[in-house]
Amino acid sequence: EVLAALSYYPELKDTPIEFKFKDNIRKSTMQAQPTFGSIFRAKEKRQYIILMSRKIQIEDEHFTMKDIPSEVLIGWLGHELGHVMDYRDRTGVGMIIFGIKYLFSGAHIKEVERAADTYAINHGMGEYILKTKNFILDNASFSDRYKAKLRKLYMSPEEVMHLIEEKQ
């Protein structure tokens, strides 16, 4: 799945990205970030890590990566690679400010998550992003409250479809 997602981002070919499983990522399934030691390096020399949770808990539902359909995982990875694309043009100080805003501003989170989806869609991953959204939103076990939170922060399937159609 990692190689499939990376194939949509040829400009990341020479960018060091480590994909690493972690037992638990707080409030997240996957997380992309520059490595701590590379934040203040020249943008071209920055390294990234994409953490992937071994165990995924969404409300009372428990999953492992093996439980997630391949196309959904590719979509999730494509979204995270969209974050890497977003980070590439930011300075070290810009990344620190970005991180602080992400911690404290819901509006900033919404902007950043939508940007990551947009990068993925513009790189031809729209169908994967759509499958990822539908995997969550069509899951009867997840509460309406949880789904409403996702709809607030991330693009809706309709918005994804609109961008896919615009791109064609």
Where are these regions (language model features)?
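Active-site scaffold of zinc-dependent metalloenzymes
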Residues: 31-70, 87
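Short, contiguous hydrophobic alpha-helices characteristic of membrane insertion segments
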Residues: 48, 72, 144-147
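Post-HEXXH active-site segment of zinc metalloproteases
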Residues: 71, 86-114
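An active-site-proximal "capping" alpha-helix that borders the catalytic cofactor pocket
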Residues: 109-126
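Long, well-structured alpha-helical subdomains associated
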Residues: 125-168
